[in-house]
Amino acid sequence: MAASSLEQKLSRLEAKLKQENREARRRIDLNLDISPQRPRPIIVITLSPAPAPSQRAALQLPLANDGGSRSPSSESSPQHPTPPTRPRHMLGLPSTLFTPRSMESIEIDQKLQEIMKQTGYLTIGGQRYQAEINDLENLGEMGSGTCGQVWKMRFRKTGHIIAVKQMRRSGNKEENKRILMDLDVVLKSHDCPYIVQCFGTFITNTDVFIAMELMGTCAEKLKKRMQGPIPERILGKMTVAIVKALYYLKEKHGVIHRDVKPSNILLDERGQIKLCDFGISGRLVDSKAKTRSAGCAAYMAPERIDPPDPTKPDYDIRADVWSLGISLVELATGQFPYKNCKTDFEVLTKVLQEEPPLLPGHMGFSGDFQSFVKDCLTKDHRKRPKYNKLLEHSFIKHYEILEVDVASWFKDVMAKTESPRTSGVLSQHHLPFFSTSVTWGAWPLAAQTPFQSGVIRCRGRVPSPRRATGGSGGQPCVCAGGPGPSFTEMGPSPSPMLSNTFFTPDPGACPGASTWGLPRRRLCQLLTTSTPGCC
């Protein structure tokens, strides 16, 4: 009976993951199938003022003495006999008139209004600039995912090169919650050096644009570029940064990330390591997460897969500690620890039934590193350490003070794994430009202007011939990374005044990408592709 109950839970969770993926694919296809010659109409929602008292319908108030009813204006209106009614018992009603769902909607609206006050400004290098989205010059697409696209842009007023994440606004409450959560966290985390920095936002009727610092690539793509493990010294510095970022989120903002994985860990040529993508982060109530968000099954903690009461999720930041442990094993060994899985169900079953993965003893890892990973992957979450305990671990203490030249290592890896620029070159004569009246996936290609030329390794979809108006069209290319802003510098800065740009497939792209470029998880080739957010 217990085994049957577990299978039912896993089946329900797998079904939820697939449903989320189908919805994500539907949204992407909807955006990409819109005719470019027909710009998306802007829908402006206005709240009408409350009707005057004279226009309001009379509110029937039950009388406690005789069971009848009268309207508020009954004293001044002609009296009419009313049919007899049976006496009514007055019931004590709760003082609030709002359901939890309506209160949640109100909270979303309030948060949006708060963020709207900050839109239209970029703060770069301590200087605040008033700006519009048209003040940004598009240098090319850097990547795309289930929640939008990421563009490399140049701020014309200063020449700064930044990353801009573009997400479409919709009537879907869950999508809007994800956008607002991402915005809320990055805007408030400006004082944490281990979280990707936000320069500002632009919000239109159709889109949300988040201007962020340009990072090099993510740990997931680095692993693919190297085609093997990442050195322990680099992972030591990475661990220090991510644990401190997660600790900051919990202590400063009461937030749990819920999507810790290699594709959400960013690095750059300066040696910086930062955490990104807070779309499915959750608020902690009494240090517990009270809401369920599927996230990526491959990195999900056992207590999230099989909670004591599935209707009342009740887990804490130690779920992210497990995800960090799985990520470290994957990056340190060069392969995902749960091997030969074909479905989410198989992964989830292995997480619950098998012993936690450990770092192999024959690969030369230090005892401190092995001990740290073992602590993170303690199956009983009640015995798994929290951040304050992890920060006292000898592995963290060692790499807090040890000097490691992450910048040189990063540059060396990026240089040695750069792809041939003559391989698989596709020509495309136009790049989309930003306008406050269009949305991602629906750019008016016929109206686009010539763009600067360069080599851009595409991690999203190259426009297909039926949607392009010039050049040789394109084809779907392999896609890596989830919806998180993997702000990847994919080649030299484009040179101005040339007529076209070449898109060349990236060597670190996922080999399991579907024909439409949707990201797949590494070892789980699902029939419906991966869970949104999985890579």
Swiss-Prot record:
Its cofactor is Mg(2+). The DVD domain (residues 393-413) contains a conserved docking site and is found in the mammalian MAP kinase kinases (MAP2Ks). The DVD sites bind to their specific upstream MAP kinase kinase kinases (MAP3Ks) and are essential for activation. Its EC number is 2.7.12.2. Residues 69-79 have a biased composition (Low complexity). Residues 393-416 are annotated as: DVD domain. Dual specificity protein kinase which acts as an essential component of the MAP kinase signal transduction pathway. Essential component of the stress-activated protein kinase/c-Jun N-terminal kinase (SAP/JNK) signaling pathway. With MAP2K4/MKK4, is the one of the only known kinase to directly activate the stress-activated protein kinase/c-Jun N-terminal kinases MAPK8/JNK1, MAPK9/JNK2 and MAPK10/JNK3. MAP2K4/MKK4 and MAP2K7/MKK7 both activate the JNKs by phosphorylation, but they differ in their preference for the phosphorylation site in the Thr-Pro-Tyr motif. Residues 136-396 form the Protein kinase domain. This is Dual specificity mitogen-activated protein kinase kinase 7. Pfam families: Pkinase. Activated by phosphorylation on Ser-287 and Thr-291 by MAP kinase kinase kinases (MAP3Ks). The modification Phosphothreonine is found at T291. Expressed at high levels in brain, lung, liver, skeletal muscle, kidney, and testis and at lower levels in the heart and spleen. One of its GO terms (biological process) is JNK cascade. Residues 63-93 are annotated as: Disordered. Its main location: nucleus. It catalyses: L-seryl-[protein] + ATP = O-phospho-L-seryl-[protein] + ADP + H(+); L-threonyl-[protein] + ATP = O-phospho-L-threonyl-[protein] + ADP + H(+); L-tyrosyl-[protein] + ATP = O-phospho-L-tyrosyl-[protein] + ADP + H(+). It is found in: Nucleus; Cytoplasm. GO terms for cellular component: cytoplasm; nucleus. The active site is at D259 (proton acceptor).
